[in-house]
Amino acid sequence: EVKGAEFGNVKHPLFPLHPNCRCAVISVIDKTADEKSDKTDDNSLDKVYNEDRDIKSIKKYMSSIDINTASHEDLISLGSLVNENFDIGGKLGNKSELKKVFSNFREMGGTISSDTWFNRSNSAVKKQLTEAFSYYPKGWADYLTDNNKKLFAGKSQRGFFNGDLVNAAQTYYLTGAAPGDGVSIYGNGIRKTTAFHEIGHMVDSFNPNLIRIEKEFIKSRTQGEKVTKLSKLFPNSNYKAREVTLKDNFISPYIGKEYRNATEVLSMGLESIFEPQNGHVKRYLGNGKYESAKITDDKEYLNLIIGIILKG
């Protein structure tokens, strides 16, 4: 949620030798083994060559995309190339493998320096954020230092991001903080998805082009659709009357939630890739039953998020 969103080796076994053995061991050439070994090596080399060639081709296409003018279609195309060649959809939740693949295209693994954390940050929330940043592009953590911003990790029942250093009730600035000094990410310190989700809002806040692209994506998917209250889609939920969405056929209606200067597109996508769990609730079927979905059920959306991870 966004708060304040106005902003093949061959082995030949040896028999055991006793200490006084005077036997000689001679080499025996196994021609079939050599043939098998050569074949394996050739295939391995071909695989490495082809993968390297694919990486170079994707990098070339990636460098041709200017994020300042890029469309959502550009990033979907980029994401599609990586997904088809490296099966991102088959690696959901495997954070180390995801990081390994994305490292082929940009520097991954962000860190937050001790002096970037705002004082009195909650240790449990801080730990979760530290882990999430370590799997994300390095540039995302660098947004803070590059803009001379502090990060406060706060504890609250419901996770949210705020573009300033504020208390959990968002009624005042934290002691010692002034407008523009930093940003806040809140969570309960237990829910694993929160950190991966809220960092997405932080990234959007530092990169207006991403918000533009995400809004273009929503618009392309919801032409002619009228907003719907989330509380109507999910009875007995805690959604407020003012929380409305363009639900489309997204894996979660929450993806189309309306903000003036923010979206849930990147945040929901990141959560769906890095910490997918059992998927998202897509719709309420009645009688206490729900339909769920994963990001692999919406390839266009998946490819968009991959593209943003690479270029955002």
Language-model segments: residues:
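Activation/maturation switch segments at domain boundaries
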Residues: 1-111, 291-312
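Histidine-centered active-site/metal-ligand motif
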Residues: 18, 197, 201, 264
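A short, highly charged nucleic-acid-interacting micro-segment common to nuclease
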Residues: 111-132
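Hydrophobic (often cysteine-bearing) scaffold residues that line and stabilize catalytic clefts
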Residues: 121, 125, 192, 259, ...
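Active-site scaffold of zinc-dependent metalloenzymes
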Residues: 126-206
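A contiguous pocket-lining binding segment that forms or flanks enzyme active sites
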Residues: 193-233
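Metalloprotease/metallohydrolase-associated module, dominated by Zn2+-dependent proteases
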Residues: 218-312
